Curated annotation (Swiss-Prot):
Residues spanning the membrane: 179-199, 219-239, 296-316, 317-337, 400-420, 434-454, 608-628, 848-868, 917-937, 997-1017, 1018-1038, 1104-1124, 1127-1147
UniProt: ATP 2 binding residues: G1227, R1228, T1229, G1230, S1231, G1232, K1233, S1234
Gene3D superfamilies named among the record's database cross-references: ABC transporter type 1, transmembrane domain (1.20.1560.10), P-loop containing nucleotide triphosphate hydrolases (3.40.50.300)
Record flagged with keyword Cytoplasm: no
Tissue specificity comment: Ubiquitously expressed, but levels in brain and muscle are especially high. All isoforms are equally expressed in retina.
Membrane topology: Multi-pass membrane protein
Organism, as annotated: Homo sapiens
Cellular component, GO annotation: apical plasma membrane; basolateral plasma membrane; endosome membrane; Golgi lumen; membrane; plasma membrane
Modification type Phosphoserine: residues: S14, S19, S60, S505, S509
Biased composition (Polar residues): 501-511
Protein name, entry field: ATP-binding cassette sub-family C member 5
Amino acid sequence: MKDIDIGKEYIIPSPGYRSVRERTSTSGTHRDREDSKFRRTRPLECQDALETAARAEGLSLDASMHSQLRILDEEHPKGKYHHGLSALKPIRTTSKHQHPVDNAGLFSCMTFSWLSSLARVAHKKGELSMEDVWSLSKHESSDVNCRRLERLWQEELNEVGPDAASLRRVVWIFCRTRLILSIVCLMITQLAGFSGPAFMVKHLLEYTQATESNLQYSLLLVLGLLLTEIVRSWSLALTWALNYRTGVRLRGAILTMAFKKILKLKNIKEKSLGELINICSNDGQRMFEAAAVGSLLAGGPVVAILGMIYNVIILGPTGFLGSAVFILFYPAMMFASRLTAYFRRKCVAATDERVQKMNEVLTYIKFIKMYAWVKAFSQSVQKIREEERRILEKAGYFQSITVGVAPIVVVIASVVTFSVHMTLGFDLTAAQAFTVVTVFNSMTFALKVTPFSVKSLSEASVAVDRFKSLFLMEEVHMIKNKPASPHIKIEMKNATLAWDSSHSSIQNSPKLTPKMKKDKRASRGKKEKVRQLQRTEHQAVLAEQKGHLLLDSDERPSPEEEEGKHIHLGHLRLQRTLHSIDLEIQEGKLVGICGSVGSGKTSLISAILGQMTLLEGSIAISGTFAYVAQQAWILNATLRDNILFGKEYDEERYNSVLNSCCLRPDLAILPSSDLTEIGERGANLSGGQRQRISLARALYSDRSIYILDDPLSALDAHVGNHIFNSAIRKHLKSKTVLFVTHQLQYLVDCDEVIFMKEGCITERGTHEELMNLNGDYATIFNNLLLGETPPVEINSKKETSGSQKKSQDKGPKTGSVKKEKAVKPEEGQLVQLEEKGQGSVPWSVYGVYIQAAGGPLAFLVIMALFMLNVGSTAFSTWWLSYWIKQGSGNTTVTRGNETSVSDSMKDNPHMQYYASIYALSMAVMLILKAIRGVVFVKGTLRASSRLHDELFRRILRSPMKFFDTTPTGRILNRFSKDMDEVDVRLPFQAEMFIQNVILVFFCVGMIAGVFPWFLVAVGPLVILFSVLHIVSRVLIRELKRLDNITQSPFLSHITSSIQGLATIHAYNKGQEFLHRYQELLDDNQAPFFLFTCAMRWLAVRLDLISIALITTTGLMIVLMHGQIPPAYAGLAISYAVQLTGLFQFTVRLASETEARFTSVERINHYIKTLSLEAPARIKNKAPSPDWPQEGEVTFENAEMRYRENLPLVLKKVSFTIKPKEKIGIVGRTGSGKSSLGMALFRLVELSGGCIKIDGVRISDIGLADLRSKLSIIPQEPVLFSGTVRSNLDPFNQYTEDQIWDALERTHMKECIAQLPLKLESEVMENGDNFSVGERQLLCIARALLRHCKILILDEATAAMDTETDLLIQETIREAFADCTMLTIAHRLHTVLGSDRIMVLAQGQVVEFDTPSVLLSNDSSRFYAMFAAAENKVAVKG
């Protein structure tokens, strides 16, 4: 097996799919065919995109699966258009496809009749479930379409290279054939829509002016009008049918391609999690809309040209004027649409930032509550929201202009044309005037769809840029080199590695230069420039590997140079982290890796996993990986699925793994044993349980190389010891194991120990050899003294099964607990299913929205403005008909001595009067339009902002149990997708809907005014309409709801996959995660596609009603020949023609607007149903400002359970902690240690008893008053995106000197001082640009600053090496000498110095005394734990 040489020639991969090019010394020779499955082909010989993707994942391809997947339209034996052409048969009798859309003939496609069966089911049942909905057609499946799009993108990259590659061009090629066809259908629509008014209506009106009646001729005209309208309606439906399928294919393809790319990324640091979620939710939607609506733009110019030619023929040169108005308005509307899109683009950036911030808040909500920082975070989100609102308002004004212009343009064009026409002395008849008005009306179609089209295309253009930047990000390197000797598993020769430009981990000691990050406040424009610079910088790095871009600590330029030249490029620098690493790891060896915080331990592991950039030397690997990350990654799935991780269930191996990882006692108390569902990020597990499940996953995977990154730090001492012996030493005996740890006692048993310092391996050998060497390792080991004291509990089995009664987290997202005994399996479900609304959107939801917009009065004002607006438009058309009627035979003129009756309008002596009022109506209309636009935008924005603020307030004030049972993806969905609907789409649709409803009523009213008998015909049509509406309403609403609830799972899948990227890479599970994603996406696409089709299904049927109305009007004109003035006949027919498209559009808007209101309903559901914590502050009950002065803590019969119906986790706990006392709290996982903290912070309210601090009952005071006086250093360090300063002091309460002092005492001053912007340096999302140890030190600095009287330490030094640990313990002792301190410990040596030790078991205090008393009693539990530990140190030390 030959491999890619990653030696001196190793390069940073070029962006895109060609990220690891073959570089061989024998460049001309071609590799053997059978070797190809482990490498990527040369770009020019690129085969199927799936193979390329599979190779990137390092997967072999099963031939049968491969051939099965290659059945694409292109490879169909009858040609790639076979499926499409078979749809041209008018009616198809065979039903060989599973989805009815694939069996539909042309007639069924045009009328969407294939959907009728689902409409019947929906009507019958009153609701729809996923079982009722057809799964997606194979032609729309994301898998098939993604491979096609991927192939086209690959070809584009090969032809022009990544920089010049155009994703727009690729998307166009992907959709080209179908879009061209849809444009052809659109042309037919436009021609039919134009010829109806231009020819049929004109002849009908001329017939009304004629004196003789000719019934046969006139009925033929009505029939002609009927046929042109049917052709117009059905060809338009066919356009939509084509566009929707194209859109669904494009959305599925590009979203799958995006996720595929995310799975292959080294890291996602260039993009925030919020941005990736937005790309995969909103941007996918934008692509669909562009494909669905974008092509309608082509219809505009055609109608404009036809209309202009026709008007000139009818009116002469003045006909140009009206068309000129249209032509001028067209670019004006385009400009307004472009401006809307420009503001939308700015808005998207603000939304990204808000969603990212929300994601952070939700992830660390427990910590935010504990620190009483809710207000600070609330203000930061509100600040971003204010900026977003400002941009939304500007976008809203321009959007309102584009929405309201279409009906006005007809009036303006008519006024200008007819006024000038008459002023110039030309005559005007009713036939001429109303034919021109009717043609103008048909021309408004172009103006109506223009805002939609331009908006969708502009937004898609932004989305395409975001997708392209994602597709060009660098991929992970799967190291393919094999070591020379078969017995060596990992070989590194003189390897120098760096975190590349997009990675952020500092991962080096404070003495090394931490990576510079750009100042977050730099403008967005600068960010784009930097991204472009980044690509050129890549080449610069290659050319200059030892140059100034790769600075070591001793090569740093002066601060002045730094500032001038490098600050804006800070994040582009490759930060050398590992230097000249020489390492050979033999097969079957257990290798321990240790070193101080930031010495490069995690970097070494990342290098082996291919996540760093190799600058010099080589790396060779032989074997497959299992990886246990420092912070365990848990899926939202059952506990068993988390361990199996896609492998077959083997009972014997599975049971052996459970025993090795001490998981049996945990299973005994979980509601459904190993079938219990685990919440997102392991929300309902303790830190120790998460770590053990992660370890069990590694053991079960049966790989050859095991990489364990500090896996025992979160475990109780005796559990850790058992796992080290049974899992790592015994279970993995024949495997190669890299074991990173801070717990030095385990290194005694390792075959080899590697000691790291400042990114170098400084000592290496067995434990004995390193002790004899008397170097850094020996010094630290001797300093340990008693060392870690992990006991092997004497009666471990009996003890563990009895003592572990609950499991709950000490990490940032937790607070759940399990039952004491096995219960009904359904109780194993922690995460509740998402609620799905029933029936129609209740009126109360509309009421809530109206109330939020300003109440009933504001609503009435807005409605009155709409009425006046549409009324002024209708008035101007009526005035024209009145003017024509007055000029038709009512005027007497004198020629010479003769007086005669003239029917010419130009002879009317009051022409000036009529013309003035006609022109004035236009001015009034424009003023009303402007007022209405401003008032409407203000109202809807006030509504959405109030809903957002109230939702946000409710979420922040919800108790912890809500966050434990609700996936973050679901809550985020409210703030991203639902908020996007309420902010942007709902106002857009509601404005058009209200305007059109009023217009429909005016149309029917005008026609009925001319022909009262018309109302008789309207009756049956109203009944037909009601039936249609009842049926379609259920169908459309239910499909929209299904679309909403299938959206959350695939967003949650993206979130969780991104968080576990390193684990997915290590286990090579990319393909499985991709398949799961495709399933979830297709599950969402199925109801989404049917929802869009259901709209058109309704539209086609409504068109038949409006065609019936126009035919009725035509028949009335024919049958009442000579009884009504031609001017009024013209008025009636012009409104009837206007009604055709308008009617179905309005009803569709009604359904769509109701569907958009489901987002308001979902937001309102949270606002109404979420229970709230106690108030932050309670008037008249606030404690004194200097409370607590002493720090005495008293528990009196305290009882607590996490949620209703769950067992107690604290049972009648009573004790008193004296002021300034230092208490160590020990006990098995689930004994209730962290529950004490939860009770003290009131994250969970007590079920009985009380807690007092300095005699004040904490349940009587406000939460903020309580929590701001307590401090906690959590087990898992929490840093927020922002600056170092904002992380330490979000309220700006402390001086710079105080902050530097806190950093100095936590040994972080040097590290922060070396950052270019010092305290203002950027902290990335999750604190990813600091190592875990450094994050923990910053958390301790934060607690030092707060300096509260009561401090809880939740095993705060678990992620630190022993040396730093000892220093920090000393700092804490000194700094908090006058504080009451509770230390929740896993490692016994951390609590030996405590004044008293509390031993917990099963939620009760079983021992509470000084360490000396407990150790002198040989029957105490603490003694048993300590004796075992003492024994181990004595033997091993």
